[in-house]
Amino acid sequence: MRTIFNAKIGDAAYIQDELSSSLSSSVASKFKEFSKRKRISDSFSDLSEELERIGLRQMRKRIKLEKSFERTPKKKVQTKKHLPPVRKKDSVKRRRIIIASPSDEEHDGKVQTNDDSSENKTEKPKNQSNCSSNASKLSEAAQLLNVSEEKSSISETELERSRQVALNELNKSERFNKTETQLDISVMEVDSSDHDEEEKTEKVGAKNNRSLYEIVDSDDEEEQDQDQSDAAKPAESENHSEIKKSTSFMDQMSGAKGNKSVYEIMDSYETEDPKEAGKNEESDKDKPAENGKSDKDKQAETEMSDEDKPSEIKSPSTIKKSIISTADEEALLAELASSDLSHLEKMFNPLQKSRRQSLHVPSPELAAKNPKLRRRSERVEVGNDFCPSQSFVDMVAEKKRQKNKRKRLSKSLSGAPEDLEEMEIKHERKRLKSSHGASTDSMEEDNENETMTVAEEHHSDGEVSNGEVPIEEKPTTSSEKPSASELPEEGNSAPPALKKDVKRLQAARQAVSHAVNLLAPPKATEAEPRTLSRKLSPQPPVVDKKSAKQKKKGKKKQKPQEASPLKSSDEENHGHRIRTNAGYVTVVDEPPTKVPIIELIKTSSGMVRVEPCTPKQKYFRELPPTPKMHGFREEPGPSGMSRKRAKHAAPKVEHNSAKQAALRFKEQIFARRS
């Protein structure tokens, strides 16, 4: 560059060409290097991002798996290291069962993949030289992740399926969402070739990884149970449920298989159907999901699972126990079905008011044979030798017929059915007294005549009906009682027609009285007619008399308010007192004109008003038209002379003009005579 700048100024074009060529070559080389580095860094960053994404995905899957493992039961397969050491006094050959545990393989694979992912996360590129190694590591990690993903997908689907089975087997009451329907168990569709390959790999894994169980001969069962109970105590704190299941499994195996060799047991287990094995696995998974249930539910489930297992595994003792328990239950159910439990309904009912009764209730057969008798007199009827007379039979039949009749009782009435007719008669008399208290003897006679005519009509109707229907002759002697079914028919065949007619008459009367009350004004009912009007009116009073309380209220008349005496002060009596030159003049109000009370007379046609001009007495005299009759008031005359003397000897009147003028003036002012 220096050489170029030291050249002549005239060679500007040359300098420009040289500069551009040198710059372009250097920039191009640098740009190439930069783009190369950029490409590598971009590829590495892309790889790192991809790795992070895969790692996050894997972490999420791992968390999901852990959660599903918590929900769903883990396979509790007891390996040899968990099994407590069994001490035996006599040296007996122990037979071993080898069971595959594929969960260990999955666990190892997961640990490896997690370690690789954690290592890959921590690694970051620092120089260009590390890029190739990092890329190779990344590709390896991706391959491992893909492999682990393939493995975990199968296990995840299996776990999900088992979880759904467990949730379906839960009762509806124990679910959180009680309205939710049963979960649909999605069935996996797998190609047959892939499935066969997986089965082969599983079998190989099962052969490689097997756990051991010790099974002792059936001769030493008792000693083994004792040793197991002794050995189980320290291990209970760590894995209580696992030890219980393992011991029960060992007991079943020892009871069922007896003194078989190792190979026979292995063969029998290997030859089991794969479906049954899958069922057992599912039941094992379901057990921890239902840990929230009570101990009773657990016991019931264990019994059910024992029943579901094949009959080869069950020992004869357990079979006997189950048969005995079922027989007991059946017997108990049969007893309950046969016994009468009606008393239990009333026993704990708080609304049922009764005496304290013992729980022992006699059977219905005994109660039907020996009925409890209320009175000693009724015990006579129990004997079969009792032969009643015809009159007694008729009397019983009549009583039953009377009882079967419909009786209309008011709420206030209460009495035995025998006294009903007497009570009704008394009630009717009281009502008649209250309504017809003011009526005279003639009215009562009319009433009696009406009722008699009604009765005669009814009697004549009865005679006609009896004449039409032939009378049945009663049997003279009959030792047997009439059947209960015949008695109510007799009661229904002869209804009381007289009562119906009387009721119709009463209803008609009530309707007429109601119409009259509507026609007459309400004030008319207040004033009662006098003795004369009663004598004039031959009809009984239609309107029912008021009750005693209303009468008392009516008697209490309002007292007339007495006017206070006039005071002399002008302030108070300024409206009634006028001051004049002659003196004070008091203005007195006219007395209120008496309104004539209109009286009423009850006639056959109805209520009649009495006008004021109608005479009130039998005999009367006509009064002369005097000024007093027209409202004038008399005042006493001048004192000193009697009227007789004034008539016979008139006094001499002195004509004084001045005096007369003064009197005239006085009259004009005061309008009064002295």
From Swiss-Prot:
Residues 127-137 have a biased composition (Polar residues). Residues 233-245, 272-312 have a biased composition (Basic and acidic residues). Coiled coil: none annotated. Residues 73-97, 400-410, 548-558 have a biased composition (Basic residues). The modification Phosphoserine is found at residues 248, 358, 391, 414. Keywords: Phosphoprotein. Residues 65-137, 168-321, 352-382, 395-585, 618-659 are annotated as: Disordered. Residues 216-228 have a biased composition (Acidic residues). This is Slender lobes-like protein. It comes from Drosophila melanogaster.
